[in-house]
Amino acid sequence: MNHSLYLVAGLGKTGLSIARYLKRNNKSFVVFDTRKEAPGLAEFQNEFPDVPIYLQQTPDEVISQVTDVITSPGLALDTPVLERARQAGASIYGDIECLAREISAPVIAITGTNGKSTVTTLVGEMAKAAGFRVAVAGNIGTPVLDMLDDEHHYDLWVLELSSFQLDLTYSLSPVVATILNVTPDHLDRHHTMEAYTQAKQRIYRGAKAVLFNREDVYTVPHQSCQADIKCISFGKDAPSMGNWGLIEQENTTYLAKGMERLLPVESILIKGVHNWMNALAACALAEAAGISMQHILNVLKTFPGLPHRCQWVREVDGVGWINDSKGTNIGATISAINGIGGSMQGKIVLIAGGQGKGADFQELAQPVSEFVRSIVLIGEDADKIESALAKVVPVVRASSLEGAVTIAKTCAKPGDVVLLSPACASLDMFRDFNHRGDVFTSSVRGL
């Protein structure tokens, strides 16, 4: 007889998917959320009318019976309920761990501060083109456990994983795993770069092959590659045999593996040096998982990129407008400024600001001084950004994103690009980064 009692910690999309998974497996469970108005509460109560739900507090007599806590990645590991459950002897893990225990199909695992969604989607498209039944999931789109049902049988899982998800995962053994890059982010949760990097490094555990960024020391595996683990790297320089990089020949830049030129960068639709790195990483991951080079390159030539990630909006009076609302941290914005600024004649007018998540905006000074004409600031941490950058370029303030678009139009000259890449989270003014990007795009289309 099974006496296990599961606690689902955190509602929302992930919590609902965990509850459905437990119900399918005939497990007893209760639910907890720190919020009084938990997202998805009405839907949960409609679907699970008999399951106890505790908001803001869980009684000790319940905690003492709990054997397993499956928590949403949004809940910090030092949340009191999780601490109490841990002290009472419960196992604590996340939905990716549940998936890892259930599936036998190979997994490609992808993390990194920036570029995860682009690379994950790109690898998924390459696998589809090669005829794989592929599940693209994790920190992107549908929660993994909603894809784990009797109707779907996948040949391959391509998982985008956040540092929070990796903190809660122990049994994943990917066919290939990568950390694309590591720059300061989520330091409000992880507190130090060391802890954040350590969380990312968990992705390599149990992997048959690892792909790292040879220009980013934080991505290099901490455990040196053992004989039975294949180590592959990518970077902007010319690659050594078996690795991936860029080769310059006769004024043309090529994506390359070893000495083999694969494709001129002009042939791919996603623009900027940072996107060339994303393309190289996707190629390396797909090939390591057994996808043919023909399918890989065909997809690269037609993949248009993802919304809100260095997405071209339009040109007005000789000025280009680019929506990079997904630039929610400094590293993403540095990549966007360097990637776009390094491939154009004019200057960038940068729209930035929002919730800075404890970041040090001084790190923007170097790329801003090289490529940016002026900055228009919005949002909660505008003061911090202004004090870090006001001596580098002219800084203007706007009370709304629509106002920032109007101001940016007057600052830009023909040949320039206006780039929305906020280097901040969006929740001070918007529902999420998608909403912020939609408001920007709509304002630009109205010019």
Swiss-Prot record:
GO terms for biological process: cell division; cell wall organization; peptidoglycan biosynthetic process; regulation of cell shape. It catalyses: UDP-N-acetyl-alpha-D-muramoyl-L-alanine + D-glutamate + ATP = UDP-N-acetyl-alpha-D-muramoyl-L-alanyl-D-glutamate + ADP + phosphate + H(+). ATP binds at residues 112-118. Pathway: Cell wall biogenesis; peptidoglycan biosynthesis. One of its GO terms (cellular component) is cytoplasm. It is found in: Cytoplasm. It comes from the Bacteria. GO terms for molecular function: ATP binding; UDP-N-acetylmuramoylalanine-D-glutamate ligase activity. It is an enzyme of class 6 (ligase). Its EC number is 6.3.2.9. Keywords: ATP-binding, Cell cycle, Cell division, Cell shape, Cell wall biogenesis/degradation, Cytoplasm, Ligase, Nucleotide-binding, Peptidoglycan synthesis. Its main location: cytoplasm. Belongs to the MurCDEF family. Cell wall formation. Catalyzes the addition of glutamate to the nucleotide precursor UDP-N-acetylmuramoyl-L-alanine (UMA). This is UDP-N-acetylmuramoylalanine--D-glutamate ligase. The lineage of its organism: Bacteria, Pseudomonadati, Pseudomonadota, Gammaproteobacteria, Legionellales.
